[in-house]
Design a protein with these regions (language model features):
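Amphipathic, interaction-prone secondary-structure segments
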Residues: 50-75
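Amphipathic alpha-helical segments
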Residues: 40-53
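Conserved short "hinge" loops at termini or chain/domain junctions
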Residues: 9, 13, 43-45
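Intrinsically disordered, low-complexity regulatory segments enriched in Ser/Thr/Pro
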Residues: 70-96
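Mixed-charge, Lys/Arg-rich low-complexity intrinsically disordered regions
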Residues: 1-8
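Ampiphathic alpha-helical segments that act as solvent-exposed interaction surfaces
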Residues: 88-117
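Short, structured interface segments
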Residues: 27-40
Length: 117
């Protein structure tokens, strides 16, 4: 049976029915539904990334970093990490089977990520 992404946990924000709510010490949980999230990407993120897609989610981890997830289906992820002030964000396109690599990548930025499959 193929692995399916069900939740992503990051930082200290919790997404409740499309509305980000800060709760501590709990983490962000973004429920995977039909290939996209209910939060639209900000125009700032779109302009900085040069990528225009429907759906997705954006989240400022802190005052320095922005993290954006795109989901095409249950098997592919696109992750964008950008630092405020940088012109070009870091873009990673990953298969679900490489979630360990994604977690290791985020650890470089001191970001803990939990993905439930």
């Amino acid at each position: 049976m193929d692995k399916i992404i069900t939740n992503i946990t990051i930082g200290n924000w919790y997404l409740v029915r499309g509305k980000p709510t800060k709760i501590s010490p709990a983490n962000v949980v973004w429920a995977f539904r039909d290939g996209c999230f209910p939060i639209p990407l900000t125009s700032e993120i779109l302009e900085n990334s040069g990528i225009h897609r429907e759906g997705g989610a954006s989240f400022w981890h802190d005052e320095h970093y922005s993290i954006v997830f795109f989901f095409w289906n249950e098997e592919r992820i696109e992750l964008i990490i950008s630092k405020r002030g940088d012109e070009r964000p870091y873009i990673a396109k990953l298969d679900v089977k490489y979630v360990d690599q994604l977690q290791n990548l985020l650890r470089v930025y001191n970001i803990n990520l939990m993905i439930e499959l």
